[in-house]
Amino acid sequence: MASRGITITTNKAITTSKSTLILKHDKFLPPRNMINEFPHDDVLRMCYRRHMRLKPFISQRSMIQTTYVDYVRYKYKNEDYPKKCRASGIAHKTPVQSVLQQAELSLRFCLQAVMQVKKGVSDERSVSNEIRLSRNMLKNILAIEHEKAKLIAQNPRQNYPILREAFSYISPTAHKSSLLLRFNALREFDRCLIRFNMCMGTKL
């Protein structure tokens, strides 16, 4: 006979062997009208902290959690995203979102990726599909980030500038370079991701 699962209930969450239901959302959800009511640096700080608080919900595997933390830290503290977009040669066909809008929308995307839909709600199927798509996409992003970290660890002097500074691997002519051929899979993924960001206003 199967043993019954253990449920732990606190004033902040209900935790089972399969999932955690957060009862107090303030530390995870962005405040309403955040961009208009808080200073620029405070908004970025709030988004960054809320991103980091999602770590336990991203995965139970420590390796994936570490990849997620490194990814968020790089996106907020090191990445020159406009330079990455320019290096890709992909033209913006819609107005570029502000840095704060990109941060908030990226946070909301990650929040959706770790959500669970309540059974029996009228739009359960469509919401579940959106959650599943977000979760799968975030999973793929982290898989690519893990692969980049491995390549950088193998040859930091060569690969860090290619993948993190000059972004030469993502240029339209990268496939013509023998040095950059090994990054073709990363190139195609990140070019698709840039287009997705342009459509959604995110900066994933």
From Swiss-Prot:
Superkingdom is: Eukaryota
Which keywords has UniProt assigned to this entry? Sporulation
Q: Name one GO biological process term.
A: sporulation resulting in formation of a cellular spore
Its job: Involved in sporulation and maintenance of the mitochondrial DNA. Is probably involved in a pathway contributing to genomic integrity.
- Similarity comment text for this entry: Belongs to the IRC19 family.
By what name is this protein known? Answer: Increased recombination centers protein 19
Q: Record the organism.
A: Lachancea thermotolerans (strain ATCC 56472 / CBS 6340 / NRRL Y-8284) (Yeast)
Gene name? IRC19
